[in-house]
Amino acid sequence: MSAVWMDEQVESSARVQNSLKIEREDHKLEKRLCREVGRAIVDFNMIEEGDKVMVCVSGGKDSYAMLDILLKLQKRAPIRFDLIAVNLDQKQPGFPKHVLPDYLGKLDVPFHIENQDTYSIVKRVIPEGKTLCSLCSRLRRGILYRVAGELGATKIALGHHRDDMLQTFFLNMFFAAKLKGMPPKLVSDDGKNIVIRPMAYVPEKDLTRWAQVRDFPIIPCTLCGSQENLQRKQVGNMLREWEKKHSGRLENMFSALQNIVPSHLMDSKRHDFKNIRTTGVADAEGDKAFDAEEFSEPQRPGLSVIDIASR
């Protein structure tokens, strides 16, 4: 047997092995996404029996992934609920209006395209060079709330993920002087809708990879995506740099959002500092005066789950 023939066999075998490895990794990613979305739904009671969930699909990777995973979970869920995909066509120049209807039409899910020219309003009202996101978001929110009522939706699902929630927390702290984040579930500001974020536990890197696996027809935003100096982007870059230098830090920060100790902050509306009294009973959470705080290495709970699942 010639060396050339043997080399070709080795290369062919390597390609097959590599293909199988990629397939296994993709399958693990799918299981992880379904598990994390399912866990968030259960932890926060996001979807209940008989719900009609309006899934907001923008054409970005996050909303595509949310719809994709919710459709998978719908088939195996212990309760019955309906999904309807909704896209708001804001009449942005160059927006490929056929992409979403074509994509959604191939799925086993009802969908609605809402046509509203918010682009012209935003460009007319906001001075050149100013951030467009605030007004665009308000207009979009009001329209989606109205559409939810017209469609009889009981929940509105948005595609925000773990990184979005962390960014929002730091944005509020840096620029609004508030310890306030992005909730996984909350009544909308009009008091008429319940907004849920099923991907609250999902890191953005998993969604980026899943978009590649599924080959979603991504539609870039010509408004938000074209503004490079947005505060959110700056905070996002900061968090990514932290994670690069200190692996596991984002996981710990996200866990901190679920582990709040009001007595160790300074908000007198959350803790009655004025009327505290001694009890004579030892308390591990009591003040330790001059003792230096001791911190363990980041546990990275999300990654430990992944490692266990991959064995």
UniProtKB/Swiss-Prot annotation:
InterPro entries: Rossmann-like_a/b/a_fold, TilS/TtcA_N, tRNA_Cyd_32_2_STrfase, tRNA_thiolation_TtcA_Ctu1
Cofactors that this protein relies on: Mg(2+); [4Fe-4S] cluster
Top EC class of this enzyme: transferase
Motif PP-loop motif positions after renumbering to this chain: 58-63
Keywords: 4Fe-4S, ATP-binding, Cytoplasm, Iron, Iron-sulfur, Magnesium, Metal-binding, Nucleotide-binding, RNA-binding, Transferase, tRNA processing, tRNA-binding
The keyword Iron appears for this protein: yes
Pfam short name (any one): ATP_bind_3
Cofactor note: Binds 1 [4Fe-4S] cluster per subunit. The cluster is chelated by three Cys residues, the fourth Fe has a free coordination site that may bind a sulfur atom transferred from the persulfide of IscS.
Binding, [4Fe-4S] cluster: C133, C136, C224
Miscellaneous comment: The thiolation reaction likely consists of two steps: a first activation step by ATP to form an adenylated intermediate of the target base of tRNA, and a second nucleophilic substitution step of the sulfur (S) atom supplied by the hydrosulfide attached to the Fe-S cluster.
Function: Catalyzes the ATP-dependent 2-thiolation of cytidine in position 32 of tRNA, to form 2-thiocytidine (s(2)C32). The sulfur atoms are provided by the cysteine/cysteine desulfurase (IscS) system.
Subunit structure: Homodimer.
Name of the featured protein: tRNA-cytidine(32) 2-sulfurtransferase
